[in-house]
């Protein structure tokens, strides 16, 4: 009976630790809702170390002044930052004036994918 209790407690502690390991987006550059010039690199900073082989992002132009179009994927390189909690998205060319959305997927040691997005505008 004692072994069962110890095993149950150990499993409970392990599960609570894993549940806390979901990465959360802490900040981004440009920040959510920012208006500015075309960024050379977009930085996403997370609460947990990322598993780069399962994490990624897409950069999408969602609106261009004076033009109606569907969301348009933009060519960009996605890489890990120097910090394992950072993801870098580097557009392959300067972004034209418009609205953008970074659709990200982050996976940490718990292996559960977490998704989200960051929107910003280029003037």
Regions found by a protein language model. Give the residues of each.
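Bacterial N-terminal signal peptides that target proteins for export
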Residues: 1-8
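N-terminal signal peptide c-region/cleavage motif recognized by signal peptidases
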Residues: 14-18
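N-terminal non-catalytic regions of secreted/periplasmic and cell-surface proteins
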Residues: 20-58
């Amino acid at each position: 009976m004692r072994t069962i209790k110890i095993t149950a407690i150990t499993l409970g502690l392990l599960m609570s630790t894993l549940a806390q390991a979901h990465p959360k987006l802490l900040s981004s550059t440009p920040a959510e809702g920012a208006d500015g010039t075309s960024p050379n690199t977009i930085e996403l900073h997370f609460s947990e170390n990322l598993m780069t082989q399962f994490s990624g992002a897409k950069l999408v132009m969602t609106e261009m002044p004076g033009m109606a179009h569907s969301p348009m994927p933009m060519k960009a390189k996605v890489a890990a930052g120097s910090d394992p909690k950072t993801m870098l998205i580097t557009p392959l060319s300067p972004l034209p004036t418009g609205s953008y959305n970074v659709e990200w997927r982050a996976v940490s040691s718990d292996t559960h994918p977490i998704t989200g997005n960051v929107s910003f505008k280029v003037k």
